[in-house]
Amino acid sequence: MLRSLFAALLVISACLAAPARAQEGAAPFDADLQRLAEILGTLHYLRGICGSNEGPKWRNQMQALIDAETPSGDRRARMIAGFNRGYNGFQQTYRTCTPAAMVAIRRYIDEGSKISRDLTARYAN
């Protein structure tokens, strides 16, 4: 499941990069990207406390999304803020891995995968 999320993120990055560069304002998929950024931040924190030994994998996925999307100014700041909001929100709630944290991880992976699939279906050539 994690591999398919990574693959979907890469496809999204490639598909969205060109249209996003052509637009100065908000892209039609910005809300989805904001949510995806928040999910990546959440997973970066929760997977870390639950002993996944993934290191900066989720942060690297976020950076890859930013690099491919090349948002400027406010869009970039909103994406980064979304990632940080996801990370900080769960940092305040969970200090150790709990069964609830494991459930949250599964749910966020599922939601991120769905967003990735939907974006790919809508905006891929």
Give the residues covered by each predicted segment:
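Bacterial N-terminal signal peptides
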Residues: 6-15
